[in-house]
Amino acid sequence: MSPVQFLQLLLPLLLVVVTLGVGPTQASRLPAEVGSQPHSVSLRRNGVHVCGGALVSDNWVITAAHCVSISGGQQSYPAQSYNVRAGSIQRLAGGQLVPLSQIIIHQNYSSSEAAGANDLALLQLQTKVTLNANTKPIDLATERPAAGSQLSFSGWGSSQAEGSFSHGLQVASRQSLSASDCQKQLFLEQEDLLCLSPVAEDYAGLCSGDAGAPAIYNGQLVAIAAFFVGGCGSGQPDGYVDVTQHREWINEYVN
């Protein structure tokens, strides 16, 4: 058993027991500018924000599977209980509210497997979003960024440990680790794990409500946020699902 605590971003689910602690305030998470993150959406269940996500076409969103999965398995909550807010940097207002018509959880996802493995779901929208300056799909990256690359992520998660969700979309930067360093630091072996570590002493990282947050490099979607380690703002690497490992699966549905 690993001496590392993995916390799902949607719920404070303790998967491995370790020392608990409260991380520092994530002051370097900055407010997103209007139109700067046109791919980012808020996934809402019964009208309440649960996760982030990214538009990958005008009627498909990608997010983390554990955001929609019942008990960590292949069955999802009813699609009609969800909608997405697209085209707004405000969690509670603006943009376009579009209900879901279908939820597709990755066929190899199971929360009983290694944390974050295959933790992806595709969400089909009932109607296409209206594309404009604030609402645009993002292209999928074709290869994993080199170690040390600086990626940005955007989400509505808490800006500090035990805080409430942010009203406005926030952005921050992290550096990617090599696959081998990522696996060693988190005691995990799955190939689709991508780790982002603090930039210098910048503790801006994932927190509750950030699951499904898109990680971007060179204007392309590289990964989807899956879990954080040791409490948000701990300064430990965050776990993402590398979407470049799942392009074939995504392209089966998204055209």
Residue ranges of each PLM-predicted region?
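A conserved glycine-rich beta-strand in the N-terminal activation segment of trypsin-fold
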Residues: 40-58, 114-116, 212, 233
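Conserved H-D interstitial segment of serine endopeptidase catalytic domains
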Residues: 43, 61-64, 68-109, 179-181
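Acidic glycine-/aspartate-rich tracts in secreted/extracellular proteins
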Residues: 21, 66-69, 87-92, 126-131, ...
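N-terminal activation segment of mature serine protease catalytic domains
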Residues: 22-46
